[in-house]
C-alpha cells in the first residue's frame, strides 16, 4: 500500500471558519478518494493566518482587561484543535458517505527545535492578516512587531521559523496508523519546543509546516509528499508577464531555480526546500505541489508541479 503525506496550506484554507469548512468539505472528497483507491494517507496543515488571528484576538482581549495574554505556543495548540476539528468533521462525513469504516484523529503535536537556531534572530514566517504599509508601521511602532511585504498582497507580521529537528509524538502517530486510523498531525508545523535536561518548553515561533511534513513523510517512509497551497503550480517569474507554471521537474532543475532567486522567502521557497529535503531522504519518492481546490485535477495529472530525482 502506497503511503502519502498530504500537507494543506493555511493560506489556502480561506479567511473565516465558514470559508475554511466549505473548502475542507470539497478537499475531503479528493482525500477520501485516495483512501478509496487503496492509498494510506496522513494529513498535516498550515496555520499561519489562523494562529495569527487567534493571537491577535487574545491579545486584544487582554489589552481591554477581558482576559489574560496567551503565549504563542498555546495559540498554536488552539489552531491545531480548531483546524483539526473541521478536518475531522469533513473527513468523517465523507468517509461515511463512501461507506468506508475508518476513524479520524487529530493529534496535538510538538516538534523539537534548537534553542540556538539562527531563525530566532531573523523572523521570516508570515502569520495573521494582510495590512497596508501604514497599518504595519503603526503596529511596529506600538508593539515592536516585524512586518514584511508578502508577494504583492500586503504586509504581514513575521515570526521566527526554526528548523524542525524531531517530532515528539512520532511513535504515537505510527501506532495510530498501524491501527488503521486516519491521522491529522503536525498542524502548523507542530508546536515548537526546546528540550533541556529532558524537559520540553514551548517557544514563540512557527515552524514551517512543509518542512515538518517533509520530516514526517521521510520518517514514515512515504512514497509521496503532496503540498497543497493557493496556486495550481510552482511558478517561475511569478507575478510577471512571463510567469510560467512548472509541470514535471527534476531536483537539479529546482535547485537551479532556487539559486536564480525564483521563489519568495516565507512563501514558495520553503515549500520547494521541503520537497528537496524529502527527496534527499527518499530518492525514489516524489513531491506534488498544487492548489487545495485543484487536488482532484492534480491527481489526474491535469495541473500541479511534480518533482522527482
From Swiss-Prot:
Stored InterPro entries: AceGlu_kinase-like_sf, Asp/Glu/Uridylate_kinase, Carb_kinase
A GO-annotated cellular component: cytosol
Biological process annotations from GO: arginine deiminase pathway
Reactions performed catalytically: hydrogencarbonate + NH4(+) + ATP = carbamoyl phosphate + ADP + H2O + H(+)
EC numbers: 2.7.2.2
UniProt xrefs under Pfam families: AA_kinase (PF00696)
A GO MF term: carbamate kinase activity
Cellular compartment(s): Cytoplasm
Alphabetical keyword list: Arginine metabolism, ATP-binding, Cytoplasm, Kinase, Nucleotide-binding, Transferase
Pathway: Metabolic intermediate metabolism; carbamoyl phosphate degradation; CO(2) and NH(3) from carbamoyl phosphate: step 1/1
Keyword Protein biosynthesis: no
Similarity field: Belongs to the carbamate kinase family.
PANTHER family: CARBAMATE KINASE, CARBAMATE KINASE-RELATED
Protein name: Carbamate kinase 2
Organism of provenance: Staphylococcus epidermidis (strain ATCC 12228 / FDA PCI 1200)
Gene that encodes the chain: arcC2
Amino acid at each position: 500500500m502506497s503511503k502519502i503525506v498530504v500537507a494543506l496550506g493555511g493560506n489556502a484554507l480561506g479567511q473565516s471558519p465558514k470559508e475554511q469548512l466549505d473548502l475542507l468539505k470539497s478537499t475531503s472528497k479528493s482525500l477520501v478518494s485516495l483512501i478509496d483507491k487503496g492509498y494510506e494517507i496522513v494529513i498535516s496543515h498550515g496555520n499561519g493566518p489562523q494562529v495569527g488571528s487567534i493571537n491577535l484576538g487574545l491579545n486584544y482581549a487582554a489589552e481591554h482587561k477581558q482576559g489574560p495574554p496567551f503565549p504563542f505556543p498555546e495559540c498554536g495548540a488552539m489552531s491545531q484543535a480548531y483546524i483539526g476539528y473541521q478536518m475531522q468533521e469533513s473527513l468523517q462525513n465523507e468517509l461515511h458517505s463512501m461507506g468506508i469504516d475508518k476513524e479520524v484523529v487529530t493529534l496535538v503535536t510538538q516538534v523539537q527545535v534548537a534553542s540556538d537556531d539562527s531563525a530566532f534572530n531573523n523572523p521570516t514566517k508570515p502569520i495573521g492578516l494582510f495590512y497596508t504599509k501604514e497599518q504595519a508601521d503603526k503596529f511596529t511602532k506600538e508593539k515592536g512587531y516585524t512586518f514584511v511585504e508578502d508577494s504583492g498582497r500586503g504586509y504581514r507580521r513575521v515570526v521566527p521559523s526554526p528548523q524542525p529537528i524531531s517530532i515528539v509524538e512520532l511513535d504515537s502517530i505510527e501506532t495510530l496508523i498501524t491501527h488503521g486510523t486516519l491521522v491529522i498531525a503536525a498542524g502548523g508545523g507542530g508546536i515548537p519546543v526546546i528540550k533541556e535536561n529532558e524537559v520540553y518548553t514551548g517557544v514563540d515561533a512557527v515552524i514551517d509546516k512543509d518542512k515538518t511534513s517533509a520530516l514526517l513523510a521521510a520518517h514514515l517512509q512515504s512514497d509521496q509528499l503532496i503540498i497543497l497551497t493557493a496556486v495550481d503550480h510552482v511558478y517561475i517569474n511569478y507575478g510577471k508577464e512571463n510567469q510560467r507554471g512548472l509541470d514535471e521537474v527534476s531536483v537539479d532543475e529546482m535547485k537551479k531555480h532556487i539559486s536564480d532567486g525564483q521563489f519568495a522567502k516565507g512563501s514558495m521557497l520553503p515549500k520547494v526546500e521541503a520537497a528537496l529535503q524529502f527527496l534527499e531522504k527518499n530518492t525514489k519518492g516524489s513531491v506534488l505541489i498544487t492548489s487545495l481546490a485543484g487536488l482532484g485535477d492534480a491527481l489526474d495529472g491535469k495541473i500541479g508541479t511534480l518533482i522527482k530525482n
